[in-house]
Amino acid sequence: HTEKNAFAKGLYSTLKVPANLTKKILVKGTPLLFNETLWASAMAMLTQCYSIRGLNVVASLNISNTINNVFNIVFIALGDSVAIIVGQLLGAGDMKKARDTDNKMIAFSVMCCTCVAMVMFVMAPLFPMLYNTNDEARELAKYLIMITAFFMPQNAFLHATYFTLRSGGKTIITFLFDSVFIWCVSVPIAFVLSRYTGIHVLVIYACVQLADLIKCVIGFVLV
């Protein structure tokens, strides 16, 4: 088998990790570690900003986030596939094919998520009925799901471009593209609108989603 899989020769002969390999892992992996940590804390901060509008908002966010996570599987899976397939082509040194494949996969991801978003938008009034809560929370959850469905194609594009950048090894750029952007743009928008204005939480939520259009432009240029 060593002739067919030369890379596996001596794979289990030692647990020692060469220093130069460790350095490469740390250089590439550390930004991703910080990125995920900052992204999670940003999500918590956004939720806190929305929660200022009352307990019904908290309940509606829990409902909508649960439903959103089910439907988001589509663009998450397609984004992961971009990283795998494009990363393989980049590793083989076929830049032209990698770029062509990436463009097609991004377009496919956006089209698939557009179809899923339509289903999600139409079914939005039904999902909150599954939960034992008051009518106001159900109504808010319905509109939050609708807003998320409206922006799902945008999120599909962002996710695919994010994993395209990661597959190319541009971890610093993905760090800036993802968590730095959300802390510097999305969180301040939610913070200011929730604390210094009286606008409805649905408008705040939509404004935060709309801000990601800036990332779409950046992602389009970088990819």
Regions found by a protein language model. Give the residues of each.
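Membrane-helix interface segments
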Residues: 56-57, 171-172, 200-201
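Helix-terminus/linker motif at the lipid-water interface of multi-pass membrane proteins
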Residues: 37-70, 88-89, 126-135, 195-196
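Hydrophobic alpha-helical transmembrane segments in multi-pass membrane proteins
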Residues: 32-44, 48, 76, 108-121, ...
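Short runs within selected transmembrane alpha-helices of multi-pass transporters and secretion channels
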Residues: 1, 76-79, 148-167, 173-185, ...
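Short alpha-helical transmembrane segments in multi-pass integral membrane proteins
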Residues: 1-30, 86-151, 193-223
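Hydrophobic faces of transmembrane alpha-helices in multi-pass small-molecule transporters and flippases
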Residues: 14-45, 70-74, 78, 145, ...
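Small-residue-rich hydrophobic transmembrane alpha-helices
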Residues: 60-124, 155-174
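Transmembrane alpha-helix boundary/anchor motif
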Residues: 41, 45, 69, 81, ...
